[in-house]
């Protein structure tokens, strides 16, 4: 099996000197130092990603939804039939899904990548039709997992080369929270009963079936945690693997990524294994009620921007947070400095960088 180093170049840090300069610059603006709290943190993070203070406006946000079906859905782990995946993909293509509305409101555009939906189709983004039931068989073959990785890399390169300045991966696929929970449990050593939630709204019996499927999947890779490509091949799916490669390649290309809920964050965990340090380029858009989500966020060292109780997927929570990220950048660009506005500083004010954005939100590595 190919090692990740053969697929992904080294991930660099966002510019640490620019991060320090951005924090210092925040303290010159017409406000008490640190008073905008996490908005300051996010603005500084984007400045560090772009390598300049103030940062450039985020004019080309792009949402890419990775769609695929899952063999494990036949185990009764979802409240909806697998046919809904293809129907929802068509709704997105028609512009009528929640993610389309959220994207339009936030000034973003949406691309739907059909990686492994369960229908007869061909195309450069297709890996296979659905995937194996991960509790008893591999999700895909060795050739297919490499194909999924290469597709994710190619999609990231296409979007960045076309001018995208911030990326949001989204998910679509009935049953996809099952491989997501299995990945999160595997990489964080959390127990199946801890990472399994209600997904699309399953009842108690459905939850028990889902726990069993996740338990069995995790058992199959119990000695393979240090081999992320093999783990992906065995217990993820083509769409999750392509998404992970997309996220990892965005980090390689120095492009920030806003993460959505449990499925996307599971892919982000895998991305950070494939391209160590990729997490330095992540923003956690929101917190999902899925119990695996905060576990994955903690493992990545991320604090979500909003908590609206959203559990739709599609990239919807990240899209809801996108206006905050754009506003954080606009504040740095459009606010006056105290000198320009003729505003007196507070007596004895400490205007050093340390008195700026609240500690712990943008870490020194930096991670939001």
Curated annotation (Swiss-Prot):
Q: Which family does it belong to?
A: Belongs to the CobT family.
Its recorded name reads: Nicotinate-nucleotide--dimethylbenzimidazole phosphoribosyltransferase
Keywords attached to this entry:
Cobalamin biosynthesis, Glycosyltransferase, Transferase
Q: Which organism is it from?
A: Corynebacterium efficiens (strain DSM 44549 / YS-314 / AJ 12310 / JCM 11189 / NBRC 100395)
- Disordered as annotated region, ranges: 344-368
For this protein, the Enzyme Commission number is: 2.4.2.21
Please give the SUPFAM superfamilies that the UniProt record associates with this protein: Nicotinate mononucleotide:5,6-dimethylbenzimidazole phosphoribosyltransferase (CobT)
Relate the protein's function as given in its record.
Catalyzes the synthesis of alpha-ribazole-5'-phosphate from nicotinate mononucleotide (NAMN) and 5,6-dimethylbenzimidazole (DMB).
The GO annotation for biological process reads: cobalamin biosynthetic process
Give TM segment ranges: none
Q: Which GO terms describe its molecular function?
A: nicotinate-nucleotide-dimethylbenzimidazole phosphoribosyltransferase activity
The answer to whether the entry has keyword Protein biosynthesis is: no
What top-level branch of life does the organism fall under? Bacteria
- List, from the UniProt record, the residues annotated as the active site of this protein: 314 (proton acceptor)
Enzyme class label = transferase
